[in-house]
Structure formats: structure tokens, C-alpha cells
């Protein structure tokens, strides 16, 4: 009798366990809500009601090689495409990673540290905001005086500055006259359909989650500095001497690798226009970020490659590198191959 009872208990346990495992897997409530509202679908595709917010950024940025200070002004037209009323704006400035008080995923040297972002002026819909960005980490919160209603826009005007870090890792001072200027502007953080505002700090141990925005921006740099940036250079004739502007334009139409500026030409100071400062203008659309570098002695190569054989559309391929960086001599060639393969296979 006891044996039969034991057998029954084992069978009952197995049946109960199978029934338990057959239940629906755990799903966070915000994901369930997104499925229910049709912004996401279980096949991984955007739902029928999917949306993203969007920004149009118009920026004027200047880099002073003497003071190592980056300064800028920007106008952001921010589109709230959600059904939510936004009562706060979350501003992201990744370069505040260099502040001593910011959390980081590892130890850093003293040369990595800097004072971080200073906002000298902030207006939202022409309302003045007194925000002390010195209290921000890589993410700051602005409580709005007037909320941004669903399917409406808000205009932000920001003036800011920050020092380039002496230690070059992801960005900063590469040498005394070469700088990689990344994460250089305050931006509106992502507001999405299942997490709301992205308030997670950047700790130098992850990549980035950004809206896809449109950018028109300029970089002001001293004469003899070449600026290399995301997007299309809009004014080569205004910043380059005619011979070098012609070389760059030719590179847009050929598979041939051209030396836009070699070592001797950069040393001779004959590449850029000889105003005290040149303003380099760029445009990039539907992209998650923009960045730029500048140098008064880096070599500059360029070519292009067909990335759409139906329309014959070409993409520019460029490289800027120190004369000692012999591995980069083949950079344009290698990137031509990569772009061609991924575009046509």
C-alpha cells in the first residue's frame, strides 16, 4: 500500500512540474504593455503603433588648441512623437564621464579627469532655465515650466563649454595639436515606449542608445587645422585651398586612393585657407550621433566606393593619421573593401 502511495506521489509531482513549466514565461510589465499597445510585436518587428522621438540639431562648435577648450551653441527642435506628456527633459552629456564625481567602470589616471560640462545658457521655448550642470553626471534632469504635449515640438537653445581631457581614450587630446572630439554636445536622452526616459549613466563600459536625428553643424578651428567629421562637408571651397578642395571633390567620384594632403603639405601650411579661423560646415541626416577630429599635421587620404549599384550611389571613404601610423596607410583601401562587400552581399 505504501509503495502505491509513493508511486502516486511521484506521478503527481511530475505532472505538477510539467504543468508549471508549461506556463507562460515571465515577462516584465513594461514589455507586456508595449505589446498590448501595439508599439512592439513578438516577431521582433516594430508594432503598428511604433514611434520614435526625433531631434533636429543645429550646432556651432569651436575648439581652441591653446586652451584645449570646446565651446558651442546649439538649437534643438525636439519632436515628441509619443502619446505621453513630457514634464521633464533628460539631457545627456557623456563627456561628464571625466568628472571626478562621475561613476565609472574602472580606475583612471589624473590625466583622464576634467571639470566637465558648463552650461552658460539654457532656454526651452524661450523660457530661461538656471541649471547648474556642475551637479550633473553623464545625465541631467530639467523640470519643464511648460510640458511638451503629445505629438508636439519644443525648441531648446543651449550654450556650453568643457575642457578636453589630457588622456586620450575614446576621445580627448591625442597629442598637443591633434584632438578627437566625441560626445561634444548636450543632447536630449532617449524617451521610448517601454522605459520612458533613459536615465542610465554612462560608465565607460557600454555603448550608446540614441535617437536618430538630423544634424547641421560647424566646427571653428585655427588655420592649418583640418577638421574631419561625420557627414558631408558642405563648404570645402571656403576652408581649403583650391588644389586641395579639388582633390577632395575628385575623391567622391573615383575608386582611386588620393592623398588629399601629405606630410610636407601639412608642414608647409598650404592646405587650408589662411584666415585666423576657418569654419568647417557639415550635415548628416537620420543618424544617431556626430563626432569630429582635427589636426595640423595628420596625413589625409580619401577615395569612394559604389554602395548601391542600381543607382551608382557612392560613399566617401577617408582616413586621417599620423605619419608614424604605418598601419593606417591601407585604411582607405581596407574600408573600401568592407563597404563594398557589406553593401553588395
Residue ranges and their predicted role:
Residues 192, 207-345:
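Hydrophobic helix-coil surface modules that form long, contiguous segments used
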Residues 22-71:
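N-terminal, polar/Ser/Thr-rich
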Residues 101-113, 161-215, 235-237:
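Glycine/proline-rich low-complexity spacer/linker segments in large multi-domain proteins
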Residues 74-76, 91-93, 152-166, 215-223, ...:
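Short, hydrophobic/aromatic-enriched beta-strand segments in well-ordered soluble domains
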Residues 86-127, 182-185, 220-225:
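Solvent-exposed beta-hairpin/edge-strand motifs
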Residues 69, 79, 107-178, 263-278, ...:
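A surface-exposed beta-strand-loop module
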Residues 1-27:
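Bacterial Sec-dependent N-terminal signal peptides
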Residues 66, 79-83, 222-224:
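Short solvent-exposed strand-capping/beta-turn motif centered on an Asx-Ser/Thr pair
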Amino acid at each position: 500500500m505504501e509503495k502505491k502511495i509513493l508511486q502516486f506521489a511521484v506521478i503527481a509531482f511530475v505532472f505538477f512540474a510539467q504543468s508549471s513549466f508549461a506556463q507562460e514565461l515571465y515577462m516584465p510589465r513594461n514589455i507586456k504593455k508595449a505589446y498590448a499597445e501595439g508599439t512592439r510585436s513578438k516577431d521582433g518587428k516594430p508594432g503598428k503603433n511604433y514611434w520614435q522621438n526625433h531631434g533636429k540639431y543645429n550646432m556651432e562648435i569651436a575648439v581652441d588648441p591653446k586652451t584645449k577648450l570646446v565651446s558651442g551653441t546649439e538649437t534643438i527642435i525636439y519632436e515628441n512623437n509619443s502619446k505621453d506628456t513630457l514634464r521633464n527633459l533628460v539631457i545627456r552629456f557623456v563627456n561628464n564621464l571625466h568628472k571626478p564625481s562621475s561613476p565609472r567602470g574602472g580606475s583612471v589616471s589624473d590625466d583622464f579627469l576634467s571639470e566637465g560640462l558648463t552650461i552658460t545658457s539654457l532656454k526651452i521655448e524661450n523660457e530661461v532655465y538656471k541649471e547648474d550642470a556642475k551637479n550633473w553626471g553623464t545625465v541631467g534632469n530639467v523640470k519643464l515650466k511648460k510640458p511638451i504635449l503629445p505629438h508636439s515640438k519644443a525648441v531648446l537653445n543651449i550654450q556650453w563649454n568643457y575642457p578636453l581631457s589630457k588622456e586620450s581614450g575614446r576621445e580627448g587630446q591625442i597629442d598637443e595639436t591633434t584632438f578627437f572630439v566625441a560626445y561634444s554636445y548636450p543632447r536630449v536622452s532617449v524617451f521610448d515606449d517601454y522605459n520612458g526616459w533613459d536615465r542610465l549613466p554612462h560608465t565607460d563600459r557600454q555603448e550608446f542608445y540614441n535617437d536618430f536625428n538630423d544634424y547641421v553643424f560647424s566646427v571653428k578651428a585655427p588655420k592649418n587645422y583640418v577638421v574631419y567629421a561625420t557627414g558631408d562637408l558642405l563648404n570645402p571651397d571656403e576652408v581649403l585651398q583650391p588644389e586641395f578642395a579639388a582633390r577632395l571633390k575628385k575623391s567622391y567620384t573615383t575608386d582611386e586612393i588620393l592623398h588629399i594632403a601629405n606630410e610636407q603639405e601639412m608642414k608647409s601650411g598650404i592646405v587650408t585657407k589662411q584666415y585666423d579661423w576657418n569654419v568647417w560646415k557639415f550635415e548628416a541626416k537620420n543618424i544617431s550621433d556626430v563626432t569630429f577630429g582635427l589636426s595640423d599635421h595628420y596625413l589625409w587620404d580619401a577615395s569612394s566606393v559604389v554602395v548601391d549599384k542600381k543607382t551608382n550611389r557612392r560613399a566617401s571613404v577617408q582616413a586621417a593619421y599620423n605619419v608614424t601610423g604605418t598601419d593606417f596607410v591601407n585604411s582607405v583601401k581596407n574600408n573600401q573593401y568592407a563597404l563594398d562587400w557589406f553593401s553588395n552581399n
